[in-house]
Amino acid sequence: TPQPPLPRPTASASADSTAERPSIIVIMDEAYADISTLNPEFGDTLFYKKLHKNTIKGLALSSVYGGGTANSEYEFLTGNSMAFFNHGISVYQMYIKAPAYSMAAHLKGLGYETLATHPFHRQGWSRETIWPLLGFETTTFLEDYPQKKKLRDYVSDREMFEYIIDKFEHKKKPLFLYGVTMQNHSGYIPDGKSQKLQVPLKQYPGYPDAELYTGLIRESDKALKYLLHYFEQVKEKVVIVFYGDHFPGLNKEFYKEVYGKEFTSLKERQKLYKVPFFVWTNYESKSVDVPLTSLNYLSNYVYKVAGIRLPAYNRVL
């Protein structure tokens, strides 16, 4: 997908001024998708759509559906596209064997603290091995979280965002934090722990997995609102990046019913690979609505609004 025009960096964020460099917090939210992109009548308005000031937002193509989270990480962090790899492989586990270029490595070279965090097992997708190779000085996992605010059996987005705020408050240098959430992970079969999260979908009855998923996304939105409210009040410059890794693997009949027909053409199937994203700043920056881009291009938007000179590879992108 061609990359839409990038906003110019604001004059107040000089490309070479260490003092002006903002902290950058990136959140890849598990299975965060906007089902109303299949049919506006679905009607569940997500929080990101309400962001207008100092916000770049839109949809981005992910290379995966229903799983394969690490490949969405790889695309964002490196700028590389999964289009050039065999279908179904995990780049993390098959190809990264030595230190590799990434956004984390570049920002580390500019003097940033680099932290990657995921409130689940460190062995997942070999993150405990791969993240340091991508330039993350510090990595934290499930055992580093209080685990007092779980939804189902997973650390909630709210607890993770509180953890992120704590790390921000204790940084010694500008912070680049990359967080991968766990709250909305499959499966979506309601049980005693999760029934209270279900949101009745009157137009589409008979899909308890979709009802549970909708409730989880509403919890994500509440947590996201909390996070941005906190950073709105922070005087230091901060960039918040948020995107979904992939569409959830819900009942295919549910998607067919929402869309109104089978997903037959390539263009129609791509609808299940479009995830929301936004890049928000707590300082003045140009707002842009992006109809469609790809996850591997998102770092360019981040560098621009942060006032950081694009690395050579990103200039090629």
Segments predicted by a language model, with ranges:
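Solvent-exposed soluble domains appended to multi-pass membrane proteins
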Residues: 5-22, 26-29, 34-317
